[in-house]
Amino acid sequence: MTSVQNNPKGILFILLGMAVFSVQDAMIKFIYNDASLYELYFGRTLVAWFLLVCYMKFSKQKINLKTHYPFLTILRVICFFFGFSFFYVSLTYMSLAMANALFFSSPFFVSILAIIFLKEKVGIRRWSAIFAGFIGVFIVLNPDFNNFDYMKLAPIACALCYSISMTITKYTSDKDNVYTQMIHLYIGATIISILFFIFTGEGQFNSFSDPTFQFIFREWFTNP
């Protein structure tokens, strides 16, 4: 597998993406008491669909749904969808700053997966930076195993799922272009969100007093 390396450009797009995610996460943190998790996910997906279609039309990109890696594509979609579900759920009981700090364990997982599945080499400087970051995550997690709050693992579960999704994205990018991969993500998110609406959208399972479970099972399309 070969690919053209353009690290500065890649870093720039990562920073822009993280900035957008930060705004989105802050909005979810602000409104989670009045909405359902997968209602928000569905709305997020519709906005993403609109922006992607507009961009592809403007740049004259062809819509191609075919994938050369059907199993990996399904796995990537599932990991991405439920990975960020873990993160959004964590915002109901921890600060946005802490959730993001724990999510930044993702470089550790990405590096391990890249070595195993992509055969990439990670130098000592990058390992040093990753290790330092992981120590920071460990400090934030504060694992007192006698009184450990396992709910803190949700952002780390998100980081692991995200890392698997990104590793698959890199692996399949030799035959599936970026637009095809994004379309697959949005198709998957749309289908899974609709399934959640069918089975939980009327709030029939929302008999919980806990804000986290209320966020997951709250009725869709209701105003507070």
Features from the language model and the residues they span:
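C-terminal transmembrane-helix exit sites in multi-pass transporters
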Residues: 106-128
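Hydrophobic/small/kink-forming positions within alpha-helical transmembrane segments
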Residues: 18-23, 53, 77-85, 107-112, ...
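Specific transmembrane alpha-helical segments of multi-pass solute transporters/efflux pumps
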Residues: 59-97
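Transmembrane alpha-helical segments that form core, pore/gating elements
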Residues: 29, 38, 52, 147-205
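Structural motif at transmembrane-helix junctions in multi-pass transporters
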Residues: 33-39, 86-103, 178-179
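Membrane-interface interhelical linkers
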Residues: 1-16, 49-75, 124, 187-224
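Hydrophobic transmembrane alpha-helices of multi-pass small-molecule transport proteins
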Residues: 125-142
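Membrane-interface helix termini and inter-helical loops of multi-pass transporters
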Residues: 26-37, 141-150, 201-223
